Design a protein with these regions (language model features):
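Substrate-binding pocket helix/loop in short-chain dehydrogenase/reductase
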Residues: 88-89, 93-101, 200
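C-terminal helical subdomain
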Residues: 172, 180, 194-230, 235-239
């Protein structure tokens, strides 16, 4: 018997990385799962795959409606879709600021807004927003990305307060540097990919990148009925990066 038997879940950015790992785990635990993505992939029988652009309200409304119809309702929403950005405070144009904010922050709002009517009808409603350790740790050359994920974290707590009377729990997961396609693309652009990989791994106290499956496990815990008294929380999956200051070994 799975933790999500009989439940219906929607995962944005669900075609790769953390989103796909989450969708697969929820499915393995008994949920019926729909994924929304710009490139959702070919039907495979295990997931409902729908194309959606979280930057477009019409696209979001249509895709969420199709997902709810296909699943027969909705119990869990995972807001995972997002884009990255590099640079200091003077490096990103206004256009890039607006684009990243529109996807990472307003995109979360759009999907949640469209899904709320169905979630309010569920006895086990849960929303999990994927934030980032960049929201709290102060990483170099991540000003825009950090600001957007900090907003997601604040949004999570405000949503949790507003939706508590409706029985909808809202939590966040903050991954450290994760082994995902976005990080792979970042490494591909680096002058020395091996050195950049080593640097990214070393900044986590446990000395390696976080896996997508580890983040998915945290999402699944917060989304499950077993976490029924947990709302407004942020669960870091970062190898201790945000809170630990271990001594360096000689």
């Amino acid at each position: 018997m799975g933790a999500f038997d009989g439940l219906r879940a929607l995962v944005t950015g669900g075609a790769s990385g953390i989103g796909l790992a989450t969708a697969r785990l929820l499915t393995a635990e008994g949920a019926r799962v729909a994924v929304l993505d710009l490139a959702p992939g070919a039907p495979d029988g295990s997931l409902v795959r729908l194309r959606a652009d979280v930057g477009d309200d019409g696209s979001v409304k249509a895709a969420v409606s199709s997902a709810v119809d296909a699943l027969g309702g909705l119990d869990v929403l995972v807001n995972n879709a997002g884009v990255g950005a590099q640079g200091g405070v003077a490096d990103n144009s206004d256009e890039e600021w607006h684009r990243v904010w529109d996807i990472n922050v307003v995109g979360t709002v759009r999907v949640t807004r469209a899904a709320l009517p169905a979630l309010r009808s569920s006895a086990y409603a849960a929303i999990v927003n994927v934030a980032s350790i960049a929201a709290t740790a102060g990483l170099p050359q991540r000003v825009l990305y950090s600001a957007s994920k900090g907003a997601v974290l604040s949004l999570t707590r405000a949503m949790a307060a507003d939706l508590l009377p409706d029985g909808v729990r809202v939590n966040a997961v903050s991954p450290g540097t994760a082994d995902t396609p976005w990080v792979t693309r970042l490494l591909d652009r680096a002058p020395d990919p091996a050195a950049e990989y080593a640097a990214l791994a070393a900044r986590q106290p446990h000395g390696r990148l976080v896996s997508a499956d580890e983040v998915a496990a945290a999402v699944a815990y917060l989304a499950s009925p077993a976490a029924g008294s947990t709302t407004g929380a942020n669960l870091a999956v970062d190898g201790g990066m945000d809170g630990l200051r271990p001594r360096h070994r000689e």
